[in-house]
């Protein structure tokens, strides 16, 4: 049923004006949705919890290998040009980096929970790093 704009009217002391009712015939003529089914949506948080369980079970690397390798080479360019890396060296750097990030996010989550929140914020990361002694 279409909404109509309501305007203030001066009362004449009679009955209040009623909303117009749409007849059954008018409803049938109205364009239907065509029976289009809405896509299924999980409740908020369900998919997040499923992803948490999935990634806690797994041991594979979460950062793609080639973008990480490009990042390592880009950072190394600042120190010395024409550096070459063994594949195992890049893999060791990636393992260490991901282990560090996972531990940092765990501590960050604890800081957010301590503040009675479930959403992590930059200030939680800063607090976690400060408690660890990484950043004065």
Swiss-Prot record:
Positions bearing N6-glutaryllysine: 15, 19, 24, 28, 57, 80, 116, 123
Modified residues (5-glutamyl serotonin): 6
Location of Allysine modifications: 5
Gene3D superfamilies per UniProt: Histone, subunit A
Modification type N6-butyryllysine: residues: 19, 24
Modification type Phosphoserine: residues: 11, 58
Region annotation Disordered: where it falls in the sequence: 1-42
ADP-ribosylserine modifications at: 11
Residues modified as N6-methylated lysine: 10, 19, 28, 37, 65, 80, 123
Gene Ontology CC: one annotated term: nucleus
Residue list for modification N6-lactoyllysine: 10, 15, 19, 24, 28, 57, 80
Pfam families for this protein: Histone (PF00125)
Residues bearing PTM Phosphothreonine: 4, 7, 12, 81
Subcellular localization: Nucleus; Chromosome
Asymmetric dimethylarginine sites (modified residues): 3, 18
Main subcellular localisation: nucleus
Modification N6,N6,N6-trimethyllysine occurs at: 5
Keyword Zinc: no
GO MF assignments: DNA binding; protein heterodimerization activity; structural constituent of chromatin
Modified residues (N6,N6-dimethyllysine): 5
Modifications after synthesis and translation: Acetylation is generally linked to gene activation. Acetylation on Lys-19 (H3K18ac) and Lys-24 (H3K24ac) favors methylation at Arg-18 (H3R17me). Acetylation at Lys-123 (H3K122ac) by EP300/p300 plays a central role in chromatin structure: localizes at the surface of the histone octamer and stimulates transcription, possibly by promoting nucleosome instability. Asymmetric dimethylation at Arg-18 (H3R17me2a) is linked to gene activation. Asymmetric dimethylation at Arg-3 (H3R2me2a) by PRMT6 is linked to gene repression and is mutually exclusive with H3 Lys-5 methylation (H3K4me2 and H3K4me3). H3R2me2a is present at the 3' of genes regardless of their transcription state and is enriched on inactive promoters, while it is absent on active promoters.
Modified sites of kind N6-acetyllysine: 5, 15, 19, 24, 28, 37, 116, 123
UniProt subunit comment: The nucleosome is a histone octamer containing two molecules each of H2A, H2B, H3 and H4 assembled in one H3-H4 heterotetramer and two H2A-H2B heterodimers. The octamer wraps approximately 147 bp of DNA.
Role description: Core component of nucleosome. Nucleosomes wrap and compact DNA into chromatin, limiting DNA accessibility to the cellular machineries which require DNA as a template. Histones thereby play a central role in transcription regulation, DNA repair, DNA replication and chromosomal stability. DNA accessibility is regulated via a complex set of post-translational modifications of histones, also called histone code, and nucleosome remodeling.
Protein name (Swiss-Prot/TrEMBL): Histone H3.3C
